[in-house]
Amino acid sequence: MPVLILFLFISLLMPNAATYADTDKLVIAHRGASGYLPEHTIAAKAMAYAMGADYIEQDLVMTKDDRLVVLHDHYLDRISNVMSEFPERYREVNGKKRWFAIDFTLAEIQGLRVSEGFSVDDAEIGGGKAAFKANYPTRFPLFKSRFSVHTFEEEIELIQGLNKSTGEDIGLYPEIKAPWFHRHEGKDISKEVLRVLKKYGYTTKNDLVYLQCFDPNETER
């Protein structure tokens, strides 16, 4: 049932859905060009655009100061150096330490270094001494070059700017992440996502945007 609700929700929002033939295909860049560059970085999104994606995905979570940032998880410890920069600012959830984006300001988050995804033994976490293990060893090396977290607004401006300079018309594919968690923390992430989309002109079914959420209660709002 949740999958059906999600499908219906996306179908209603899909631009010009009835105009696509059965043989048409859409290329949706999942987390950007995440097989080549660290996921959800501006570099990964620019590369996905250059590779010819029709839509580019944005997973969205909120910061302590109510900004939308592009992250697959609502925590930071899988893709950044947050553990060494803020070793004490974690929450323990089911016996596991997690550094949640909602506990940091945008400025603090954008000061972190972003990497290809990794895992770490929980017993080794603390003081920046943990041994990171790449989740996908053949992808971009861990903590090489310089990448950071960016806002939803920054990514929209990148895509709209490239649309203008290239003459293409590439769409957005935002996902509202963990709305239940944000509500528990007193934040209405869905309302903020809709506000930002409206700010940048995405207001009708004909606009090039999919809006997705895997929480059926949230889609019914």
Where are the regions a protein language model picked out?
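Phosphate-group recognition and catalysis centered on beta-loop-alpha active-site segments
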Residues: 17-221
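Bacterial N-terminal signal peptides
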Residues: 3-15
